[in-house]
């Protein structure tokens, strides 16, 4: 049997769009260790543009980055996906970049 999250694909014409920038808090432990990278989060955005669920698709374990990425996405409001002008709840993948200045 396939493992992993049971993600149903819901067709849509326009994907959800963040209303504001996704701003993760860079964990101190990762900064001190000089860890950079991209965490890919799969998120369910409901028809009101709220983030209902988050799962790590591609993470950087044991650095705090996965949690920081999910937290940042949970705090972001989205314009919901549209299917034929109707708002629909959908799963999308969102890459969150962690770059040291």
Question: How would you label these PLM feature ranges?
Answer:
Residues 80-101:
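Cysteine/selenocysteine-centered motifs that mediate thiol-based redox chemistry or coordinate metal-sulfur cofactors
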Residues 29, 33-40, 45-82, 89:
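A short, well-structured alpha-helical segment
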Residues 16-17, 65, 69, 100:
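Low-complexity, compositionally biased segments
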Residues 19, 57-58, 97:
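Residue-level detector of conserved, well-ordered beta-strand and adjacent loop positions
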Residues 1-32, 71-75, 94:
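Acidic, low-complexity proline/glycine/alanine-rich linker and hinge segments
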